[in-house]
Amino acid sequence: MIYLVSHNKSLFQTDKYVEATMKQAMSVLLPLKLCQLDTETKGLDCHTKALLTIQLGNKDNQVVIDWTTLTPKEKQIVKNYLESDRLFLGWNLMFDLTFLYVQGIYPKHIWDGMIAEQLLYLGYPAQMREKSLKAAAWNYLNINIDKTVRGKIVNDGLTTEVVIYAAGDVTYIEDIKEKQDIEVEKQGMKLAVELECEFVKSLAYFKYCGVHLDVTKWKAKMAKDQAKLNKAISELNAWVVA
């Protein structure tokens, strides 16, 4: 079942999901030791684009939280949940974590299915095995996840269609993990997956903080690099013609 926590009453003119208070949502989420996590945003840059929703749940129940309408008290409840000792399962969590860091939310324990998939197929040609959630759902579960709605979020924001789509992204990850875990054990990669997933938090924080860059010096470097490239191309062309 899909639950939506939102103070935007226009989103509840449907029977595709049910309205839930934060208390009701927590009654669904608190028993979970493994919880799937995803977000929807208005763009890719965590510092200039808004966090729209946080999705939490499992294959039986999904809770979509409309972050844009929450009260400070409700946001604190979500923060406390995400910073608990639960293991949060996601896909390409570096992206989601940067948006959570902007909100002052720092999950402790995460597992990233995309990282596990990359490790399992490390060294294979990229085209042999796609690493997206859509591809994993098909490869492991024979389930087709429709991603067409994702392109509408930037312009449309949170709509009934987006709520349903968002819930779908926290439905299948646990089942995929169970399948991946079998292969991870076969290849003796359990520690490697744990280490790489732990590093995702640091990488996300690095991305969130950014890097100080001297623009003037960097442009000067670019000019030198371009000059070297032009010279190399000129010399190569002269050699070929000769």
Outline where the language-model segments fall.
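Conserved RNase H-like, two-metal-ion catalytic cores of nucleic-acid enzymes
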Residues: 1-135, 226
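Short secondary-structure junctions
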Residues: 87, 144-146
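Mixed-charge, glycine-rich, non-catalytic linkers/tails in nucleic-acid processing enzymes
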Residues: 107-110, 146, 151-242
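Internal, well-ordered alpha-helical segments in soluble enzyme and binding-protein domains
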Residues: 129-137, 169-172, 176
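Glycine-rich, acidic and aromatic/proline-enriched surface loops and short helix-turn segments
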Residues: 138-143
